[in-house]
Amino acid sequence: MTAHLSYVEAVVVGAFQGVTELFPVSSLGHAVLVPALVGGRWAQDLSVSAHRSPYLAFIVGLHVATAAALLVFFWRDWVRILAGFFSSLRHRRIRTPDERLAWLIVVGTIPVGLAGLALEQLFRTTLGKPVPAAAFLLLNGVALYAGEVLRRRVAPVADEPAVPDAEQQHGDEASDNRLAQLPLRRGVLIGAAQILALLPGISRSGITIVAGLWRGLSHEDAARFSFLLATPIILAAGVYKIPELFGPLGAGIGGQVLAGSIASFVCAYLAVRYLTRYFQTRTLTPFAIYCAVAGGASLVWLALR
């Protein structure tokens, strides 16, 4: 991607990133597959596997915008969570649900943070290609469907200890209180599932929702915990690479980055608003079908080209 990237292209990519980052369909997998399937200049300019691609600087702005959308949508939760975190440090113990939820997010973020520092560039350069991305997208669909199947088998047993007052409690704060009842080790396991999202085609939100379902959470609570977990890691990934945005890779694309970031923010906000309502009554199955079909069809298309 060079300075000739049009504003229309920047807005389209930004909007696509904002939606696919939060929908359980893998933003990285689509970022690899869509340019390859479209071909032409898109395949050349929008490469995530090239080590010095300006597209990587563009993606930094989109990540920061997506994280900002999550912070705005969940701002009440983050006020309570941050207050709980600092309160626990001050008192040197965990006393309230907000304090416990804060530490669940901390311990759930550490594994993927360390893995990302060690493996992100390796995975992106070696696996950030169309065929691996299509294969992992297919596997993502299988994982989402398997999560639903296992959820139906274990739900009657798993829901009792994890969510004792689920039918009586309603609202965002009630959901946070239910999440705070998770043992810390379960928070680590659910958060560690994000490591798989370093693979192009595996969805961060999808795999953490599946992990939450396997550990006895409802769809609503699993999705909420997934989005709360995603916020610090997406923000950290963007902030960590901000020097690339203001370095040589970002030269000449400032306007496009701004346009794409605005589109990403708006679409990410609308996406999380929709999904938090969707998972109150619905499941991962439609996304599983989409990923399996899209991944399988992409493999066939790439093989026949």
Swiss-Prot record:
Q: Which InterPro entries match?
A: UppP (IPR003824)
Where do the TM regions start and end? 18-38, 55-75, 103-123, 130-150, 187-207, 225-245, 246-266, 284-304
- The residue stretches assigned to a coiled coil in this entry are none
- For this entry, list what GO says about its biological process: cell wall organization; peptidoglycan biosynthetic process; regulation of cell shape; response to antibiotic
Q: How does it sit in the membrane?
A: Multi-pass membrane protein
Functional description taken from the UniProt entry: Catalyzes the dephosphorylation of undecaprenyl diphosphate (UPP). Confers resistance to bacitracin.
What is the protein named?
Undecaprenyl-diphosphatase
Organism, scientific name: Mycolicibacterium paratuberculosis (strain ATCC BAA-968 / K-10) (Mycobacterium paratuberculosis)
Gene that specifies this protein: uppP
